[in-house]
Amino acid sequence: MVFLSRPGHTFYGVIILKAYHRNINWTGFVPDAQGRERLISTLCLLHPSVSRQVLGKSLCGRSIDLLQLGAGDDPVLLCGAFHGMEWLTSLLLLRFTAQMAAALETGALISEIKLGDFLRRRGVMVIPCVNPDGVEISIHGSAAAGECRELVHNASRGDASRWQANARGVDLNHNFNAGWEALHALEQQQGIHCPAPTRYGGEYPESEPESRLLCDFCRSQYFRHALAFHSQGEEIYWDFGEHTPEKSRLMAQVMAASSGYKMSEPEALATGGGFKDWFISYLHRPAFTIEIGKGKNPLPLSDLPNIHQTLEEMLVFSVIM
């Protein structure tokens, strides 16, 4: 428990939390809403350079958090956990946020780069978990879907451990308005006609509060570029149609060279409908999908340290490019 003293007296809670933070076991807890809340609260208390706001709510009323640090000009947007089983991406982003905050506050180097100097001129915004309902369902089962629990139970045939969609059975990364009609036709051809654990794109683009919230935010706020983190495959997707900026290829090459990940093109049922696709198509600015790690979703917590080490330099470059 953290005890806070009266105004004007020593803030003993910070001392306790600093001792805790030095030894945070990023792989030693359940990565659900409660665990994520504990990490975010700790980060914001320890690091005054990190500000937090609730960007909006999911279908089930769970908070979708936004973390900001650095100068407010020309920010980069980093988003994770679009899919229920891909919660490791949210932990990766929180861990990198802690690194960025330390770099800004203490001058610490990240991959031998003084990222703090850059953050004093430009900013970063992080949405660790775009799909909090999906994450909760994949970890705790259909009961976590609230009023949608019967839908989830039926669509998952009683086993929601491989749930990727939101609580309404809509795959958020098929719900953005970029090639949505063509993707919807492909879904129909594959027999995907209704809410499902994955790959059902909804009745129309931005039908879901989570995808609509993210689009509204990007329409209201200028971002230099955006990165959407998924798992798995160790791949970087960087283009979408005629509006892909010329510099996107070079940026992807830099990220690939620094991480060892390969530049790829998506398969048919992963073409269009995604956040990266919409960002490029609608805003005409660079956006990337980063498929972290390798294996079978959900990737284990024990993979996080190696994934973070592999991607650290790439993450730094993604912020400063």
Regions found by a protein language model. Give the residues of each.
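Conserved beta-strand elements of the Class I
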Residues: 75-77, 288
